[in-house]
């Protein structure tokens, strides 16, 4: 079941998701041992490893340009994607090219190309723009690069309020997913699913 504590991590827009997922979610696994052992942990735990959530740890943080501004908040993020939960819940979100992809954040944002990043957004409703993707994923992951704080908010995609994850996102940070009705551009709440591998970490 989805706990009260988990519901508190999602935004108001996602509260209805929690209600739907509560009927199907597996009991969350225990938090990682290193978090349990911390005394007086901050409200949003920070990790020395900036790519702690990465699905592919071959990512080279030193190659990221310009100097990234790392996200330090714990709010829910979202990602529109064409892959269904049978794939994402098993694999997480893997980047297209961790080794040889475009590491410059501005170049990656302005021109869609293979990169070590997986994009997410602060904006729950952005899926309405990318509704043809088919699914709106809810993500609770530490870190990520705040794109607008890194390259400014005057670029043409600034309204997407992106958080880019170098190395992608491991499956345990995906809360769940709602399919999107491509006609009405709304989430099909009755078909939302929770991720049995999701592990709360804060």
Model-derived regions, located:
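NAD-dependent ADP-ribosyltransferases
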Residues: 2-13, 29-202
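C-terminal segment of classical bacterial N-terminal signal peptides
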Residues: 19-28
């Amino acid at each position: 079941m989805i706990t009260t504590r988990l519901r508190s991590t999602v935004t108001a827009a996602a509260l209805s998701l929690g209600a739907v997922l509560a009927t199907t979610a597996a009991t969350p696994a225990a938090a990682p041992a290193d978090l349990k052992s911390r005394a007086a942990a901050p409200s949003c735990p920070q990790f020395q490893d900036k790519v702690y959530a990465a699905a592919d740890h071959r990512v080279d943080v030193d190659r990221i340009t310009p100097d990234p501004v790392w996200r330090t908040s714990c709010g829910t993020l979202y990602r529109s994607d064409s892959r269904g939960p049978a794939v994402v819940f098993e694999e997480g979100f893997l980047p297209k090219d961790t080794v040889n992809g475009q590491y410059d954040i501005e170049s990656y944002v302005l021109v869609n190309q293979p990169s070590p990043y997986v994009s997410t957004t602060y904006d729950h409703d952005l899926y309405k723009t990318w509704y043809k993707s088919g699914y709106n994923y809810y993500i609770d992951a530490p870190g990520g690069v705040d794109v607008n704080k890194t390259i400014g908010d005057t670029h043409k995609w600034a309204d997407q309020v992106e958080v880019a994850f170098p190395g992608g996102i491991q499956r345990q940070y995906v809360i769940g997913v709602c399919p999107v009705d491509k006609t009405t551009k709304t989430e099909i709440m009755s078909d939302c699913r929770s991720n049995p591998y999701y592990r709360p970490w804060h």
